[in-house]
Amino acid sequence: MQHTINFSAAINQSTVNGLISNCLSAINQGASELVIHMSSPGGDLVSGFTAYHFLKSLPVQVHTHNLSNVESVANIIFLAGSKRTGTTGCRFLFHPFHWGLMGTSVDHTRVSEWSASLDNDLERYIDILESETDGLKSREDWKKIISSATIATATTAVEWGLMSAAENAKMPLAPGTYWWIMG
């Protein structure tokens, strides 16, 4: 049975815990397929990588669908789907990673650690992009796309291998089980 999870939230520890909880509850209730309708402005990198690896570990088919905007670290959560689609008006935003450091006092070692962490996160992010899109773009292409704050439309997303098709979301009337994560 298909279960549909509606994820319309920023990526953070709380919303990813909600996603994990809903996925496990759906599987415990007999779900053989999870459809995740997504719209997210992105958010916390650690939470995004956690969600990606969690979804890839599930013993059921995961279909991700971009309802509107999938941005920043939400891109890799979207790429965890074994089937990936999006509405004709959807978009994907790629941009350089950043951390907010307002009011924080740190030493040189901590700044170096943060810089190394951001560099490593970028490499992991590009590893996922390359793997999930079957290498349709090179590492250098992905780095340019990210560094230039690029928006990919539905058509571009299909060309780049981010999704297989642009189509409207489908909500089965019955039987169906629905879950929500909102932020």
Short names for language-model regions:
Residues 1-73, 79-183:
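N-terminal organellar transit peptides
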